[in-house]
Every structure is written in C-alpha cells, then in structure tokens.
Amino acid sequence: MNLRTAAELLRSGQMRVLLGAMRLVTPYYRLLWLVAAFRSGLIARLEGGARSFEELARDRVQDAADRDWLRAWLELGVRVGQLRLEGERYSLRSYLARQLARPANDAIAAILEEVATLHYRLVLESPTRMAAGRRFTLADQDGVLVARSSPLLRPFVHEAIDEVVP
C-alpha cells in the first residue's frame, strides 16, 4: 500500500476497520489452504521431505499453462506459514502441517475439512435457509468425512453419556 492510499484510509476512518478485517482473513486462508493441501495429497507428498517445484508440478499440473497457477498457490502456502521455500524446494513448515501428514491424525484433518466445507456452509447459509424455511438435511453432509472425523469426538460422546446415564 502506498502512502497516499494509507493516508486516505486514515482520513476516512477505515484503516482500523480494515486492519481488524484483515486479521480475520489470514487464519481463514490458512485453514482453506491447509485443507486443500491435504485433499490434494500435497501434505503427504511433502512428508518425505522437501520437493522441487518441478517434482510437485509433475503430478499436479496437466496443462503447462497452469504451472504459474500452481506456483501462486504454493506461494500462498508459504505466505500463510504452512510451507517453507528454501532455494527451489518446498517443505512443510508448520507443526500442524507436519502432523497432518501422519495417518494417525486423519481424524484431525477430517475435522478441519469439515469446518472448511460443511460448517462454513452451516454458518453462512443458515439465515437464508431459515428465512426460506429450508432446513439442512443429512444429504447436505459428507458422510465419509463425518465418519473420518468421528473417532476424535468419541471420547466426548462417551463422557456426555456417562454424565447422563448412571
């Protein structure tokens, strides 16, 4: 942002609002990028160590014209702190990304995917659906995803049952 733009935002009183809004954007992009990287197999691919752009492009880009698109998407991963780029090699940077690469943490990956896909719809669409009288149904859920995430919730369900059932 140049000085003139910053000055205009300050004069209009919007700078503080903009900064507050931007604090929400990065974690949201971080979540979406992490889920997309997991779904696409990138996290599993990088679990074994750093890979060059060429190695990643080989199995992720069918049309050579999309190589810049992949590079921009990988750069987003770097910017949101999930990837590291050293030289020309990408690796997993964050603790969370490295841990999601482990099969034992699939339920946690599924919870994140559920939040990024289903929960976002529940939150975003609820007011409109209520106004139209259109409830969510089981068909709005991804059963496989819910099944993948459910082992993580099992101890909480057991705890709730233990509190209610003698």
Regions found by a protein language model. Give the residues of each.
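Long, low-complexity, charged/polar intrinsically disordered regions in eukaryotic proteins
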Residues: M1-T26
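Conserved Class I S-adenosyl-L-methionine-dependent methyltransferase catalytic core
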Residues: L9, R23-Y28, L34-S40, A44-E47, ...
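A generic structural signal for short
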Residues: L31, V61-Q62
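Short acidic, hydrophobic short linear motifs in intrinsically disordered regions
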Residues: G49-R60
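A broad structural signal for alpha-helix termini and local helix breaks/kinks
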Residues: R60-V61, V165
